Regions:
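Alpha-helical assembly-interface signal, strongest on the long, hydrophobic N-terminal helix that forms
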Residues: 2-81
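Short, conserved structural patches
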Residues: 2-3, 7, 69-189
Length: 189
């Protein structure tokens, strides 16, 4: 009869595992890589979304530069879109720019309009492509507007066109033109 040494007795329990620890290690490593990959994609989406928000903030800060140009424009919806899109494109944005413009029917001493700028860009997944997900659209927007005219004696300039001719959405097209839809306004307006 063979007598086992003390060390052989201690490691004898590992001989009965038949690779279970190895399988457990491989499985947990696979799960860990999966969660790291998903975290990486979500982190990159978050970074892209923050970059779009920064562009929105840039245009929002420029609104005082554009304010009089919009105020005295014959077509303030189209001119708002043109100015906003130019500012966005100068900052190397290649996605879709959509500007919603809505002005209330002006009175002789009062004028109010709202502008919503919406930026959309495609994000191509890095890790989730393994599971068949290719792209997702990241969209951010910000609202702005202006009210002017306070007193009864204020005289406010208005465009000759009725507000229904320039209220709506203006969407950039890949060829550099834009599309106009008078019925497309945000639901929460």
């Amino acid at each position: 009869m063979k007598c086992k040494t003390r060390w052989e007795k201690k490691f004898d329990c590992f001989g009965r595992e038949d690779g279970n620890i190895l399988l457990l290690f491989a499985g947990s490593l696979t799960v860990l890589i999966f969660f790291i990959g998903i975290s990486m994609d979500l982190g990159l989406i978050y970074l892209k979304r923050n970059a779009l928000k920064n562009l929105c903030q840039l245009v929002k800060e420029d609104r005082f530069t554009f304010q009089d140009s919009i105020r005295y424009s014959n077509n303030p919806g189209k001119d708002s879109f043109t100015m906003i899109e130019d500012a966005i494109r100068r900052n190397h944005f290649d996605g879709t720019v959509k500007v919603y413009f809505k002005e209330d029917i002006p009175e002789t001493n009062y004028r109010y309009y709202k502008i919503r700028t919406q930026l959309s860009e495609e994000y191509s997944y890095t890790f989730l492509k393994i599971f068949g997900a290719d792209t997702t659209t990241i969209t951010v927007y910000f609202d702005g507007g202006e009210t002017y005219g306070e007193g009864i004696s204020d005289v406010i300039w208005h465009p000759a066109l009725p507000v229904s001719s320039y209220n709506g959405s203006y969407t950039s097209q890949p060829d550099g033109s834009f599309g106009y839809d008078s019925a497309d306004l945000p639901a929460d307006w």
